From Swiss-Prot:
Entry's family note: Belongs to the TMEM176 family.
Stretches that traverse the bilayer: 65-85, 93-113, 127-147, 193-213
Subcellular locations according to the entry: Membrane
Protein name: Transmembrane protein 176A
A Pfam family this chain is assigned to: CD20
Organism placement in taxonomy: Eukaryota, Metazoa, Chordata, Craniata, Vertebrata
Major site of localization recorded for this protein: membrane
Bilayer disposition of the protein: Multi-pass membrane protein
Length: 241
């Protein structure tokens, strides 16, 4: 009987080790669940009003920077299409190119300053923001002031192939009517393309003006709110007296 008891007690020896390993696995899973709950807790709990306002302002600023980059690229691309046509004031000024370049730089530097910080990036961001506003204003003035130039490019007699030096005399055969109609159709298509490109450029520059004014408006609103909060205790003290 003693040998049987010893034989039965021998395989029961590693049982505490198996229980200990199982306990460690459960504690690791519990830590993982607790860590996930702690990460999800800020998302589930309601945020304070100050934090939500700051987050809203940051989203508006990021949206304005993205708009500056996208609209700057669009301005450069549309400005490149102007070189299809003959020489115009808007094309010769290079307004779409330098306006788009300044807008892209302003948006990119604003994102870099948001990530890195620093006084130099802050100064460069302010300088490029002012430059983006100025260039967009100048480009809008140039584009709106010279919008009528398509009348001089696509004039009525552009498809007239009859020589003007021919002496007046007996009526002759008119030029090929099919070729004249085809030329007129192509000219009308180019005219519509030119007008649409100029209109899109004006729209892009107006949106750039709004995007460059948005950070300034947010800054003024923030200062106004701070001043209002400072003046509120003074008014309460005056009323109490």
């Amino acid at each position: 009987m003693e040998t049987v008891d010893c034989g039965e007690a021998a395989p029961r020896a590693p049982q505490p080790a198996s229980i200990q390993v199982h306990f460690h696995h459960e504690s690791g899973l519990a830590k993982l669940l607790l860590g996930g709950c702690s990460l999800l807790q800020p998302l589930l709990l309601p945020r304070p009003r100050a934090t939500s306002r700051a987050l809203g302002r940051h989203r508006l600023l990021a949206t304005s920077w993205v708009m500056q980059i996208v609209l700057g690229l669009l301005s450069g691309v549309l400005g490149g299409f102007l070189y299809i046509f003959s020489s115009t004031t808007l094309r010769n000024s290079g307004a779409p190119i330098w306006t788009g370049a300044v807008a892209v730089l302003a948006g990119a530097v604003a994102f870099i300053y948001e990530k890195r910080g620093g006084i130099y990036w802050a100064l460069l961001r302010t300088l490029l923001a002012l430059a983006a506003f100025s260039t967009a204003t100048a480009a809008t003035i140039i584009g709106a002031g010279r919008f009528y130039e398509y009348h001089f490019i696509f004039y009525k007699g552009i498809c007239n192939v009859s020589p003007s030096w021919r002496p007046t005399g007996a009526p002759t055969l008119s030029p090929d009517l099919e070729r004249l109609q085809q030329c007129t159709a192509y000219v009308n298509m180019l005219k519509a393309l030119f007008i649409s490109i100029n209109a899109m450029l004006l729209g892009v520059w107006v949106l750039l003006l709004l995007a460059s004014l948005l950070p300034l408006c947010l800054c003024c609103w923030r200062r106004y709110r701070r001043k209002e909060k400072r003046d509120l205790p003074l008014e309460e003290t005056v009323r109490s007296e």
